[in-house]
């Protein structure tokens, strides 16, 4: 944005694991981060299954819950804590306490149905980001509330590493190619994105001003299927 305003021809690419850039359906790095988180949670599930535990896993998501939502659904989490799940006027601490109670209630419901192990996926905005509590603190408090042996794990920056998936490599190549083509034409002040499978570009200032919401179909699953 600053370089474009200074008159330097610039074309931006949407590169973030959070998938929270509104001008594009998909951001480079999101699929890789989701797969890293999913594989880690799958491995954590192996140990909680054999020891009849609950695992609370904190994933990245400071302002948007894309990783938590999609990874939580993909791994069959019993509860998913999203940054977007905040009531009007609610402080981060109040949200944390409310979500903690909701988790405990969900686990008790599962116990009554005969479940012996649980996975909970929490975005960092719910816990550590706002210095409300660590995921380990939450696990200890949930254990006291439910009597279920509960462990907390923060995946942290492993979500920013790893070998890129095919989807990320192809997305980066398609968008990068498009960026080079418009720069060769002397066009700048643009951001490249993907909409409905098509690569396109738009004004960089307009793109930065846009807001992106979580997809309603996945939110409907989150609300009604009982994750």
Cite the ranges covered by each PLM segment.
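Short Gly/Thr/Asp-enriched flexible loops that form oxyanion-binding sites at enzyme active sites
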Residues: 1-8, 68, 134
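Short, acidic/small-residue loops that bind anionic groups at enzyme active sites
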Residues: 3-36, 81-85, 154
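Structural motif
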Residues: 8-14, 53-57, 78-80, 116-121, ...
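Short gly/pro/ser/thr-enriched loop/turn and capping motifs at secondary-structure boundaries
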Residues: 16-21, 87-90, 128, 159-160
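Short, well-ordered, mixed-charge alpha-helical segments that flank or form enzyme active sites
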Residues: 18-22, 63-67, 201
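Short, conserved micro-motifs enriched in small and acidic residues
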Residues: 27, 31, 62, 166-174
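Accessory alpha-helical/coil subdomains and C-terminal extensions
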Residues: 30-148
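C-terminal non-catalytic interaction/assembly regions of soluble proteins
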Residues: 131-227
């Amino acid at each position: 944005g600053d370089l474009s305003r200074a008159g330097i021809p610039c074309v931006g690419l949407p590169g973030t694991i959070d998938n929270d850039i509104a001008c594009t359906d998909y951001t480079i790095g999101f699929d890789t981060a989701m797969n890293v988180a999913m594989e880690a949670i799958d491995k954590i599930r192996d140990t909680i299954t054999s020891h009849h535990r609950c695992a609370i896993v904190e994933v990245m998501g400071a302002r948007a819950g894309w990783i938590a939502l999609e990874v939580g659904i993909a791994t069959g989490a019993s509860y998913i804590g999203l940054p977007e799940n905040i009531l009007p006027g609610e402080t981060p601490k109040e949200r944390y306490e409310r979500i903690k109670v909701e988790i405990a209630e969900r686990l008790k419901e599962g116990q009554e149905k005969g479940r012996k192990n649980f996975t909970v996926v929490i975005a960092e905005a719910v816990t550590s980001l706002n210095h409300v509590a660590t995921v380990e603190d939450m696990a200890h408090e949930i254990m006291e509330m439910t009597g279920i042996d509960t462990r907390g794990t923060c995946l942290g920056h492993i979500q920013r590493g790893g070998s890129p998936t095919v989807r990320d490599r192809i997305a980066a190549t398609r968008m990068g190619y498009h960026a080079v083509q418009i720069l060769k034409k002397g066009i700048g002040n643009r951001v490249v994105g993907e909409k409905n499978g098509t690569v396109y570009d738009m004004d960089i200032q307009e793109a930065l001003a846009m807001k992106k919401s979580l997809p309603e179909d996945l939110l409907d699953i989150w609300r009604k299927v009982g994750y």
